[in-house]
Amino acid sequence: FNPCPYSDDTVKMIILTRENKKHDFYTLDTIKKHNEFKKSTIKHQVVFITHGFTSSADTENFLAMAKALSDKGNYLVILIDWRVAACTEEMSGIQLAYYSYAASNTRLVGNYIATVTKMLVQKYNVPMANIRLIGHSLGAHTSGFAGKKVQELGLGKYSEIIGLDPAGPSFKSNDCSERICKTDAHYVQIIHTSNHLGTLVTLGTVDFMNNGYNQPGCGLPLIGETCSHTRAVKYFTECIKHECCLIGVPQSKKPQPVSKCTRNECVCVGLNAKTYPKTGSFYVPVESKAPYCNNKGKII
């Protein structure tokens, strides 16, 4: 009995660029019908976005992130929709009981992303340095598994994987080979926003602890857990739109205010985090309302 079975046929992709914002779904077979995939070379930087448990690629938060990316840097954004294997189509009352099935599908979805990556590299001449993955919750571990698989296939490493509140249950006590891990890409950026659905275990090159684990504006701990878990997606979207929106202070320097930050000791959450010299764990104060920024206009 597997209520949320995985098969390549049930995974779909939405492909967005600045010129083409249609939310059409493609498969490995039909992807060649998309204008970008009719070309012999894809010159865009490519970003994969992968959702988590009981979610889908066409939810408002992920489409907003994709739009921010294509507006900002004319990225080619591939949203991976694995809703069947993520138990999204099951009845809401019993979905939670099926979590372990979705969790065990993450490696298979990761392998799928690696297959698409191989096609991008070998058929469309996209260098691995031009590809990053962003994943939320179970999608963060999926992205990690994709990072392991492309190395296994001899393609090298992705430039970056960004894990947005990686799922804690079934993963937080796993060793590196069974979860997202800092060796899965050249740079692995983790944004932690919850303690039960997510985890406060450090997993990446940099780990940002946003306000600890209970996000402002999300209500009481536990009751606001889903809101806190989802905030990671919203925070990162704002960090794409606003440079240095969220600045991380080294955990060892907490409670040093963000205003005292320099480029050599603090790190800005976002697409440019990897250009900062410091690695490790960072504390990130956040505001309770969008755009959540803590930098008061400061850029380091």
From Swiss-Prot:
Q: What organism is this sequence from?
A: Vespa basalis (Hornet)
Q: Which PANTHER family match?
A: LIPASE, LIPASE MEMBER H-A-LIKE PROTEIN
For the keyword Secreted, the answer is: yes
Q: Which keywords annotate this record? A: Cytolysis, Disulfide bond, Hemolysis, Hydrolase, Secreted
Which named protein is this? Phospholipase A1
Activity regulation remarks:
Local inflammatory effects are inhibited by antiserotonin drugs (cyproheptadine and methysergide), indomethacin, betamethasone, and antihistamine (chlorpheniramine).
Q: In which tissues is it expressed?
A: Expressed by the venom gland.
**Into which family does the record put it?**
Belongs to the AB hydrolase superfamily. Lipase family.
Q: What stretches pass through the bilayer?
A: none
Please list the GO biological process terms of this entry. killing of cells of another organism; lipid catabolic process
Q: Note the Gene3D superfamilies from the entry.
A: alpha/beta hydrolase
Q: Which reaction does it catalyse?
A: a 1,2-diacyl-sn-glycero-3-phosphocholine + H2O = a 2-acyl-sn-glycero-3-phosphocholine + a fatty acid + H(+)
Q: Where is this protein found? A: Secreted
Tell me a Gene Ontology molecular-function term this record carries.
phospholipase A1 activity
Q: Name one GO cellular component term.
A: extracellular space
> Could you name the active-site residues?
S137 (nucleophile), D165 (charge relay system), H229 (charge relay system)
Q: List the disulfide bonds.
A: C4-C87, C176-C181, C218-C227, C244-C268, C245-C293, C261-C266
Job of this protein = Catalyzes the hydrolysis of phosphatidylcholine with phospholipase A1 activity. Shows potent hemolytic activity that is responsible for its lethal effect. May act as an allergen. In vivo, induces local inflammatory effects.
Enzyme class (EC, first level): hydrolase
Q: What is its EC number?
A: 3.1.1.32
